[in-house]
Amino acid sequence: MRIRQEREKLAAGDRLEWVSLVFGSAPSPLAEPISRLRRAVEGRTTLLLHPLQRYVTYRTERLTRHPFLHAEMCSPPPEMDLKSRFRWRDFFSNGGTLFLDACPQSHSGNNEDAVADSWKSWGKSIFPDTGWSPLNRGHELSYSFYLLDKRMFLGERGTPVSLLEQDGRVILVHNRSRRWSWDTLKNSTVSVNLNEPLLEIHLRLYINLLMLMLTGDYKSDQLHLPTILLRRR
């Protein structure tokens, strides 16, 4: 009985929640484990992770409860009033990161490009003096986490991902391509090895994002990841 309790305690401590925001009055879907990604991630890192897809209703007063939030850009962004702006700033100053993602095909509507652009402007309005920059081959997120200094091959044009940084830290990620979305990866058949090249790069990029979420200072001092996690906790 005690051994089982210890295992459950360890599993809870290593559980990785990918928290997606739900907008409007619709009830939040139930949380669901992502076993395929768990096996693929564990094959590439020193951690035993238990990825869990979780959904929370959008409330600005609850933002700081989470270190990382994911929002699919299926509708125009919510109003950014003064109170919301300062609550988002509190979220980021507490180490939070927000990922603005392409809308899945099943929920997409008209004017997808215009909606994606409006979210980009919405994100910039939180810190008007900052600007978006593309995720290119020179950025630290393009270096594969588990291969140390090896770059991922992102191609000449990089990815359709833009970053907004504050004080040298990524606080906002904007992806306008459904092909590179979290929904596409989550529903793909991934493995520890032998993935097709594009899917492999897709998976590596998201592992880097997960490590960014967990550590808060991604690869900046080359410490072993468990040490960084203990320090952050």
Features from the language model and the residues they span:
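Short, surface-exposed beta-strand/loop "edge" segments at domain boundaries and coil↔beta transitions
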Residues: P27, P78, W180-D183
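Aromatic-Pro/Gly-enriched surface loop or interdomain linker
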Residues: M1-F68, S75, S188-R233
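Helical hinge/lid and interdomain linker segments adjacent to catalytic or ligand-binding clefts
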Residues: A31-D117, N175
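Short, surface-exposed loop and linker segments with low hydrophobicity and enrichment for Pro/Ser/Thr
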Residues: K9, R87-W88, Q166
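An acidic, glycine-rich "communication" segment
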Residues: Q105-I207, R232-R233
